[in-house]
Every structure is written in C-alpha cells, then in structure tokens.
Amino acid sequence: MANKTVLFNKHLESNAKMVDFHGWDMPLNYGSQIEEHHAVRQDAGMFDVSHMTVVDVTGTDACAFLRKLLANDVAKLKVPGKALYGGMLDDNAGIIDDLITYYLTDTFYRVVVNSATREKDLAWIAKQSQGFDVTVTERPELAMIAVQGPNAKAKAAAVFSSDQNAAIEGMKPFFGKQAGSLFIATTGYTGEVGYEIIVPETEAEALWQALLDQGVKPCGLGARDTLRLEAGMNLYGLDMDETINPLAANMGWTIAWEPTDRDFIGRKALEALRDAGTDKLVGLVMEEKGVLRHDMPVFFTDAAGVEQQGVITSGTFSPTLGYSIAMARVPNSIGDTAEVEMRKKRVAVRVVAPNFVRNGKQAF
C-alpha cells in the first residue's frame, strides 16, 4: 500500500493524475503540467510536499552534533530562523542526502530531508548522534505546502492571520519562523520567491483550500521537476547520490572548509578528492528540436585533443525557454561546447553554468 499525504482527497477533488513516488501516492499533474509550470513562473502555484521528512534536533549538543553531521557549518547561523542548505556525507564523502537546516535556538534545530531517503537518513542520524546530548524527533504529524511564484507571497498573506503576517514581515530569503500553528519559511525548489509552510496535518486541508480560494494553482510532480531543473537545483537520486561527492554535484559552495579543525563526517575523503580533482556538474542547452534526457552520453574534445565523455543526470524540455536543458556530470576539462548522443547521432549543445532560469528570466 502506498502512503498517502493528508491532502490526498484534495488532489482528487482537483482531478489530479496520481502516481507512485517512492512509495507515496502523489499528483503528477492536475491536467496540464505546462500550465502549472507557467503559473509558478508568472503568478502563483502550490505543491503538496508533505512527503518530505521533518526532523527536530534538540539538546545541549545540538549545534556540536550538526557540525559533525553536515558538510556545511550550522555555527554560521547566528540569527534565529536562519537556514542553510548542504549535504550529509558518509565517510567516503558520498552524499547520503541533501537537506535544509533551520537554526531556531542554540538547543533547537529543524532539519528537512527528502522522502525517498527517509529511512536511511533517520538511521544514519540516530547512529551518529550516539555520544551527543541530543534528541532526534521525527514530526510525521506535520504536513507541508510550498507556495511559489511572483504573486505567491501576496496570495499567502491573504490566507495568513494578521499576527502571522506581522511575524513574517520583511523576512529575508532562507529563513523560517513559527507563526501561530504554522512554520513559514522563505525557501523553495523552483527559483521563484515564495514560502514553504509546515502545517499540522489537522489544518492542512483548510490551508490548501484557502490558498485555492485565493487563486493559487495546484501543481504536481511534473511541474516541480521542470521548475527545479530550470533553477539548476539538484534532485537526489538523479543528480547525486552516495556514489557522488558534493564537488562533483555543483555543491562545492555548501562545504564549509573553515574552520579547518571542524572534522565533519567525510572531510578527509573530501579533501583528498578536492586535491586530486573531480568531475563537475554543468548545464547543457540544446536549441535544436529534441529533448535531452537522463543517462544520455555527452562527448567533448579537451584542450589536449583527447575525446572525453560524461553523462546527463537530469534533462527536460524547458517550458520557460522553449528548448531543452540538462545537467550533466563531465570531466572538468570541458569547454563551452559539447555533443550529446541522441537516436544514434551526435547533436551539438552549449555548456553553461547549471542555472537556467531565475525569477522568470533566463539566467545564463
């Protein structure tokens, strides 16, 4: 039996096409993936992300524990509510998961991890917490709704209470705040502004309906994937996994090398990889007809005249740009052009930074 989120019946009311997503019944779309995509780029859309896993880490050693567990450094978080993104690595510097961590107090951090990795994440966190004075608490009674797009904040404000709106007024990107029963965060997975709202399951249907009544368009997994790929955001299991280190996944910016005496899990292996040099994750753009897809081979000739090969990790048709885009893992000697093998022939592509669309506009 697949898991169902508390919003399952609301999806059916909106004629969602449901699919299995890592053991969860989730909406693929509500009729038109393209319309849902454009709604987020041009207006406001919302996603049920209640399948994500919310984990609270509390106790006197919470900061010290997370400084060991994560490649990014939670000690950088000085203002309550501030969040950071980063990887949780194994001893070989492979990525167990990518996650967001919110600093709420010196003894209370909230971590949001992926659904597909829930069981291994919880087991790893529990194992690594031994010897630290921390309590790790999963919060399955909390649902989550992401409201994204240029008009998302205004439409959400019409749903929030006056006290909630006052609590989050002027909140900067990558912050989260408890406002009444809602934990409201300025985070997302689309490259647009908006909120990710953690809500008690008992209130989730009412919040979803209130947002619907404000004209926020429900969006499924299909649009979520094209939006995150346009924004150059990794999808765990496609763009990186335990066989990939963060330097080869465009996550170098999330590694806190300083202070040098912080011995986070995977650090020694990661330093060796950094010194030896790794593959890198790049963006590809193909303006000809056709769609770049996961696992297609990528070829280029390096400066020494040697042919090199990489592979597409994520690819799609970009509704915003009107042509195909992809992320590919390639040797770091790549230049600004390459070829992708499609239907037994090679097609020229441009190589760009893996960030295609931000705030509705071309980003490269």
From Swiss-Prot:
For this UniProt record, the keywords arranged alphabetically read as follows: Aminotransferase, Transferase
- Kindly list the GO CC terms recorded for this protein: cytosol; glycine cleavage complex
| A Pfam family per the record | GCV_T_C
Q: Give one GO biological process term.
A: glycine decarboxylation via glycine cleavage system
Enzyme class at the top of the EC tree:
transferase
Give yes or no: UniProt keyword Signal.
no
This enzyme's EC code(s) = 2.1.2.10
Query: Could you tell me one molecular function GO term of this UniProt entry?
Result: aminomethyltransferase activity
Reactions catalysed: N(6)-[(R)-S(8)-aminomethyldihydrolipoyl]-L-lysyl-[protein] + (6S)-5,6,7,8-tetrahydrofolate = N(6)-[(R)-dihydrolipoyl]-L-lysyl-[protein] + (6R)-5,10-methylene-5,6,7,8-tetrahydrofolate + NH4(+)
Report the Gene3D superfamilies cross-referenced here: Aminomethyltransferase beta-barrel domains (3.30.70.1400), Aminomethyltransferase fragment (4.10.1250.10), Probable tRNA modification gtpase trme, domain 1 (3.30.1360.120)
Q: Which PANTHER family match?
A: AMINOMETHYLTRANSFERASE, AMINOMETHYLTRANSFERASE, MITOCHONDRIAL
Give the protein's biological function. Answer: The glycine cleavage system catalyzes the degradation of glycine.
| Family of this protein | Belongs to the GcvT family.
Per UniProt, subunit arrangement is: The glycine cleavage system is composed of four proteins: P, T, L and H.
Q: What is this protein called?
A: Aminomethyltransferase
Query: Which species is the source of this protein?
Result: Shewanella sp. (strain MR-4)
